[in-house]
């Protein structure tokens, strides 16, 4: 990998572990629960986070194993499985897998010669479409070796309930260094102890958690109602407009888009195809600036342009496509 990457620390010693705060919650949030259970009802909507890295050469296998083991100490969520409460009464609970095995989650394969980058992408596609074993921590990684030019490919797949995109970047950062030599005395944490949590136990934890949160929720509700009432007396029109604005925002979130969307994507299957289009960040920034937009604007415009050409190739004309935009809620 290039040594100029500003997102990769010089070594693991330079990692600020206090910044790796995700994965601390014992219980899934409502959003994470939705992502976890959605694929059971609609498998076509599976959306794992898949990161594909192209390496100039294959890393030492034992060092890679050690790096992932170390990362599982720093981020305990890596060692955790999701336990559904009895009858799904509540949100799933994260529990340390008593049978956690790095060798199950991290594998390697050597492609038969001749092998180019497209052959490696086919392996990535297979990994991306395999459903997770929900009795284990929902992530997997694969080192693909044997490319004709000496390069290697490292692909990591994580379930969206584990973390968001920013958390995924943090996790990948933990596995990298700009120094080729091993890092001694890097900061470490004691791995969490294995647990044997059952669905009944998960339900019990949910009940206890809700009881503990109830007083604070009631207090917040009372304070909120008092503040709204006071504001309504002093500025009734402002309060009414804020309430209506909130209601409209909520309606936009929970109401499905009015448009039918793409006829080509409506009945899509479980298969996926991977391809690459290389564009340098400086070139993309220059194009965005020329059009009066941001880097993100240019990226989204390129995606929509690709969808437009895809539909044209199949003789379909679509004026608009509903899309979801992930937004980082981190502070």
Q: What do the PLM-derived regions correspond to, one by one?
A:
Residues 2-33, 41, 48-331:
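Soluble acyl-CoA-dependent acyltransferase catalytic core bearing the H(X)4D motif
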């Amino acid at each position: 990998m290039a040594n100029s990457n500003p997102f990769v620390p010089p070594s693991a010693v330079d990692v600020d572990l206090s910044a790796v705060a995700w994965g601390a919650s014992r219980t899934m949030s409502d959003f994470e629960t939705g992502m976890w259970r959605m694929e059971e009802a609609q498998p076509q909507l599976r959306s794992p986070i898949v990161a594909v890295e192209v390496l100039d050469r294959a890393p030492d296998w034992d060092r890679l194993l050690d790096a992932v083991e170390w990362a599982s100490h720093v981020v305990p969520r890596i060692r955790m499985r999701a336990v559904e409460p009895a009858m799904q009464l509540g949100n799933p609970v994260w529990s340390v897998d008593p049978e956690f095995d790095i060798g199950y989650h991290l594998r390697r394969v050597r492609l038969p010669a001749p092998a180019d980058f497209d052959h490696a992408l086919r392996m990535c596609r297979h990994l991306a479409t395999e459903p997770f074993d929900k009795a284990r921590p929902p992530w997997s990684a694969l080192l693909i070796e044997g490319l004709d030019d000496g390069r290697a490919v490292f692909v990591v797949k994580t379930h969206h309930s584990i973390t968001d995109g920013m958390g995924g970047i943090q996790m990948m950062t933990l596995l990298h260094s700009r120094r080729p030599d091993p890092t001694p005395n890097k900061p470490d944490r004691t791995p969490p102890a294995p647990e044997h949590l059952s669905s009944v136990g998960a339900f019990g934890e949910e009940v206890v958690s809700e009881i503990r949160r109830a007083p604070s929720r009631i207090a917040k509700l009372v304070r909120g109602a008092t503040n709204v009432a006071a504001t309504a007396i002093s500025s009734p029109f402002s309060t009414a407009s804020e309430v209506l604005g909130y209601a409209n925002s909520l309606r936009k979130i929970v109401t499905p888009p009015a448009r039918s969307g793409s006829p080509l994507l409506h009945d899509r299957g479980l298969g996926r195809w991977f391809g690459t289009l290389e564009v340098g960040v400086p070139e993309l920034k220059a194009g965005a600036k020329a059009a009066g937009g941001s880097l993100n604007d240019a990226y989204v415009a390129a995606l929509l342009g690709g969808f437009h050409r895809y539909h044209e190739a199949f003789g379909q004309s679509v004026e608009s496509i509903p899309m979801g935009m992930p937004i980082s809620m981190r502070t």
